[in-house]
């Protein structure tokens, strides 16, 4: 069989799937990875990388679909780079996600635990509480667009005003803003040249309270009066309640949403969400689970895994705005949360006051550094790290604490199994595993693991 070459387009039969939602075909006994493809499909894909150990290809067309496949409800599916599996019935999505995660556990030789299944999202559509949209154009020099990056493209932006993973308030805000700026002839920000004005639109909406926060992100390269746009956005008849409109000045070179300066154009600079009877203040850049209803399910599982922590001290590492820690404080004697992002810690402290919680404290700093300075010892540790997992330095001290139990909440099962391997090498056993889907239509998933220290 001849060698496969880069940019060659050919037909593949998808035989397996690996995290995150990457279909696997075979060529000369070598794996061919095709993002978005699923087992049972026959697809056309263009080869993008040829390596000694693997081949990567980009999905171009589905030649034969799997039984039960449906027409995606989103008109931009396949063009927008956001969702990958909207054509699959939800039960099939869960089946594939479960298969991907359990394969990682099997490959890492992690076994002997109680597997508690996969829990689906309460909402399959309109579940997101935050979106970061980008200004741009779909065709270079074309009409202004506002939305998500196009599939397999670093620069084309798809206008996503019909997106069905957010509710109507998001859609009307996006549509209003893009139509307004189409009449103003203002330059979009060009990342490579570092010139332009319009960068991003951020919308946050608390699903349980209905509170809405809108932020327009621009550079300082144009002096433009936003009073008219502010009044237009205030006049909309929302399903929820508009609480604030912000103007974020971002002159940074990186292609990411951040702020050098934040100006409040209307109202306040935060919204409040309610999760499991507690209130949480969410500012523009606060980390908060993007599926509020799903978060309630996820946190309920975490609390179940914690078990009886009365008379116990719980460390909540990578605590963000302190959501899990504050929920755990209702059961624990004491909770100490540690988080790198100072703004998130300030929000966590405000949330403890909001909820009249007195047994929960938060420290800002690098987890790896702060835990070396804490004199108290935890009875239980909650780990909820970002996608890269627990840093090696932090892991050293997690192990040194010698806590009887660890509850690990992971948004990346690949780094999860790596970290579990380290913890197992130092005397911990994986007791329980539960998968929780927070992101229908996408390849992402959460996993909750209970570890117990072996008595030697």
UniProtKB/Swiss-Prot annotation:
Any one GO molecular function term: 4 iron, 4 sulfur cluster binding
Keywords noted in UniProt: 4Fe-4S, Iron, Iron-sulfur, Metal-binding, Methyltransferase, S-adenosyl-L-methionine, Transferase
EC number: 2.1.1.-
Binding sites annotated in the UniProt record for [4Fe-4S] cluster: 74, 80, 83, 163
InterPro entries, sorted: MeTrfase_TrmA_AS, NA-bd_OB-fold, SAM-dependent_MTases_sf, TRAM_dom, U5_MeTrfase_fam
Coiled coil segments of this chain: none
A Gene Ontology BP annotation from the UniProt entry: rRNA base methylation
Positions bound to S-adenosyl-L-methionine: 289, 318, 339, 384
Gene3D superfamilies reported in the protein's UniProt record: 2.40.50.1070, Nucleic acid-binding proteins (2.40.50.140), Vaccinia Virus protein VP39 (3.40.50.150)
Keyword Zinc-finger: no
Domain TRAM stretches: 3-61
Active site: 411
Keyword Transmembrane part of the UniProt annotation: no
Family membership: Belongs to the class I-like SAM-binding methyltransferase superfamily. RNA M5U methyltransferase family.
Protein name per UniProt: Uncharacterized RNA methyltransferase CA_C1435
Organism: Clostridium acetobutylicum (strain ATCC 824 / DSM 792 / JCM 1419 / IAM 19013 / LMG 5710 / NBRC 13948 / NRRL B-527 / VKM B-1787 / 2291 / W)
């Amino acid at each position: 069989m001849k060698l496969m070459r880069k940019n060659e387009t050919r037909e593949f039969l998808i035989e397996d799937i690996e995290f995150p939602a990457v279909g696997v075909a075979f060529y000369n006994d070598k794996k061919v990875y095709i993002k978005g493809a699923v087992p049972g499909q026959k697809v056309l894909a263009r080869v993008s990388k040829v390596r000694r150990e693997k081949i990567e290809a980009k999905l171009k067309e589905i030649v034969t679909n799997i039984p039960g496949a449906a027409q995606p409800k989103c008109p931009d599916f396949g063009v927008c780079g956001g969702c990958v599996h909207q054509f699959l019935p939800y039960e099939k999505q869960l089946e594939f996600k479960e298969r991907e995660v359990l394969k990682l556990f099997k490959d890492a030789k992690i076994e002997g635990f109680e597997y508690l299944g996969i829990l689906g999202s309460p909402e399959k559509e309109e579940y997101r509480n935050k979106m970061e949209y980008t200004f741009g154009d779909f065709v270079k020099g074309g009409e202004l667009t506002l939305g998500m990056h196009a599939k397999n493209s670093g620069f084309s932006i798809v206008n996503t005003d019909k997106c069905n993973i957010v509710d109507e308030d998001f859609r009307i805000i996006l549509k209003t803003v893009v139509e307004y700026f189409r009449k103003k002839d203002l330059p979009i920000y060009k990342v490579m040249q570092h010139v332009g004005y319009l960068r991003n639109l951020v919308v946050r909406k608390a699903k349980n309270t209905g509170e809405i926060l809108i932020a327009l992100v621009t550079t300082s390269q144009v002096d433009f009066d936003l009073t008219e746009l502010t009044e237009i956005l205030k006049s909309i008849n929302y399903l929820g309640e508009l609480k604030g409109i912000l103007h974020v000045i971002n002159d940074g070179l990186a292609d990411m949403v951040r702020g050098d300066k934040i100006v409040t154009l209307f109202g306040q600079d935060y919204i409040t969400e309610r999760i499991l009877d507690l209130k949480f203040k969410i500012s523009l850049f606060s980390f908060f689970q993007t599926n509020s209803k799903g978060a309630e399910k996820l946190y309920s599982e975490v609390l179940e895994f914690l078990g009886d922590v009365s008379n116990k001290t719980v460390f909540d590492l990578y605590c963000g705005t302190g959501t899990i820690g504050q929920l755990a404080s209702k059961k624990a004697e004491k909770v100490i949360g540690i988080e790198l992002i100072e703004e998130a810690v300030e929000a966590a402290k405000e949330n403890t006051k909001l909820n009249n919680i007195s047994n929960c404290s938060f420290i800002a700093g690098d987890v790896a550094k702060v835990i070396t300075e804490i004199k108290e010892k935890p009875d239980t540790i909650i780990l909820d790290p970002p996608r890269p997992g627990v840093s090696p330095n932090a892991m050293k001290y997690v192990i040194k604490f010698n806590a009887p139990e660890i509850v690990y909440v992971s948004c990346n099962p690949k780094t999860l199994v790596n970290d579990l391997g380290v913890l197992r090498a130092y005397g911990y056993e994986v007791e329980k595993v539960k998968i929780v889907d927070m992101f229908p239509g996408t390849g992402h998933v959460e996993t909750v693991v209970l570890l117990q220290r072996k008595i030697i």
